[in-house]
A protein has these predicted regions:
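Alpha-to-beta junction loops
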Residues: 173-178, 201-202
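Short secondary-structure boundary segments
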Residues: 38-39, 132, 182-184, 207-209
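Acidic beta-strand-loop-alpha-helix segment within the catalytic core
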Residues: 72-167, 215-236
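Acidic, metal-binding active-site segment of PIN/NYN-like and related structure-specific nucleases
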Residues: 31-35, 200-216
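Residue-level signal for inorganic ion chemistry
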Residues: 15, 26, 57, 86, ...
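Glycine-rich active-site/cofactor-binding loop and its immediate structural neighborhood
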Residues: 48-89
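N-terminal subdomain of lithium-sensitive/metallo-dependent phosphomonoesterases centered on the IMPase/IPPase/PAP
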Residues: 1-54, 231-234
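A C-terminal functional module that forms or caps the active site or interfaces directly
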Residues: 191-198
């Protein structure tokens, strides 16, 4: 079944079951670590797993195959491990700090492919993904809409994919140049942050400041476009 947390924010039985299974495994394998998960799990700890059991729930609820789990291990605002999965494409993305970012099949049985962002350095050649806050009446939403229009004019093209996690994976894999998102929470981002960074990308807020787990406006890029995007995204 589907529950509506708000007019546009949904949760399915699958979210809840996935969270239960992920939490069970993490508690068993790393009992000393904390866990924060989107659907309510909260165990304290110095090192904390941040879990979105199904990033892209709206997509999933419409049978739109662009969604998957996102898991990051954090020490404060530092991400130590990141894992994302796309069950519909049999793709597993993963990174450990200082060891690069990789993609493999879901069972990790093939030869891992090292990930690297693109070197595109002009906006009109760049493909973007975007994310919006749930509250369509908020100023944050209206500002993001203005930024979306600017990006549409200046870029090769822009998408609104419905999954922050897989958008981050696509930046790391060189499939898109940037993900620009407003209203995203830590559980949306934690699994993919390190994967992008280890693939050579850059992550800040819209003003170019370092991110924290409390950041709500995210600029993720291949790095070469970053300064140009900070200027483009400014709103007086």
């Amino acid at each position: 079944g589907i529950e509506y947390k708000s007019r546009v924010d949904v949760v399915t039985d699958t979210d809840k079951r996935c969270e239960e299974e992920i939490v069970k495994i993490l508690r068993s394998e790393t009992p000393d670590f904390g866990i924060i998960a989107e659907e309510g799990t909260n165990f304290p700890g110095e090192k904390v797993w941040i879990v979105d059991p199904l990033d892209g729930t709206t997509n999933f609820s419409h049978s739109y195959p662009f969604c998957g789990p996102s898991i990051g291990l954090c020490l404060g605002d530092e991400v130590l491990v990141g894992v994302l999965a796309d069950p519909f494409r049999d793709e597993l993305y993963f990174a450990a700090k200082g060891n690069g970012a990789y993609m493999n099949d879901l069972h990790n049985t093939g030869t891992p492919q090292k990930l690297s962002v693109t070197s595109v350095d002009t906006l009109h050649k760049a493909l973007f993904s975007s994310g919006f806050p749930h509250d369509k009446e908020s100023q944050m939403f209206k500002n993001m809409l203005e930024r979306f229009i600017r990006l549409e004019y200046e870029s090769h093209s822009i998408r609104k994919t419905g999954s922050a996690a897989l958008s981050l994976a696509y930046v790391a894999a060189g499939r898109i140049e940037s993900y620009v998102a407003s209203g995203q929470h830590s559980w949306d981002m934690a699994g993919g942050i390190l994967i992008v960074e280890e693939a050579g990308g850059k992550i800040t807020d819209f003003e170019g400041h370092p991110y924290t787990m409390g950041t709500r406006e995210w600029l993720i890029s291949n790095g070469t476009l970053h300064d140009t995007l900070v200027e483009l995204l400014k709103i007086d």
